[in-house]
Amino acid sequence: MADLYLVRHGQTELNVQSILQGWHDSPLTARGREQALTARTAFAARGVAFDHVYSSPLGRARHTAELIVGEGRSIELVDDLREWHFGSLEGTSNREMPPQPWGDYPVAFGGESEVQLQSRMVAALSRIMARPQHDCVLAVSHGSVCQEFLEYVTGGGELPDNGAVLHFGYCDGAFSLLGW
């Protein structure tokens, strides 16, 4: 069984302000950088050595991945690991959004549906894990993406905190949750 460690990026300036980010970007806060370094320390203490590292191309995820694996390590940027696209809703206050689940709500604003998000994420992680010699993989992504993947694997899921690490097993094309 192969291991997939799916990490939500560290806290950002817009997280602190409760602003819906989507594909908009925002730098990590000091706390966000600390969350990434804490994950790095935890992986090292457990002897986890990644053979491949992937990240959303958005700066907050890429920076989190860089802090986790250190300088000089190759990180493959994968567009399909990006956050849920909310269209023109991006940049608005989370308080202005209806309660979750949002389903197709963002579609009316030029965004993608929840089904599209989950399909995109599952396909991306399945392609990654099906590659040869992918026994221990780090993928850094975003809150809604992690939540949707967790729901796909377990049938339910809540929004992981910034810096959260979700550990999945992958065998014969199927994922299982091993730890969170």
Range-by-range predicted roles:
Residues L4, Q133-S144:
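Generic beta-sheet signal
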Residues L37-P98:
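Phosphate-coordination/substrate-recognition cap region in phosphate-metabolizing enzymes
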Residues L6-R62, G110-M121:
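Loop-to-helix element that buttresses phosphate recognition and phosphoryl-transfer chemistry
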Residues G155-W180:
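Domain-level recognition of soluble alpha/beta enzyme cores
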Residues A42, L67, E71, R127, ...:
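Active-site catalytic microenvironments for nucleophilic, acid-base chemistry
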Residues P98-Q116:
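Short glycine/proline- and acidic residue-enriched helix-loop micro-motifs
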Residues A45-A49, I128-C136:
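Glycine-rich phosphate-binding loop signature in dinucleotide/nucleotide-binding domains
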Residues G10, S56-L58, D80, V140-S144:
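Short, well-ordered beta-to-alpha junction loops that form the rim of enzyme active sites
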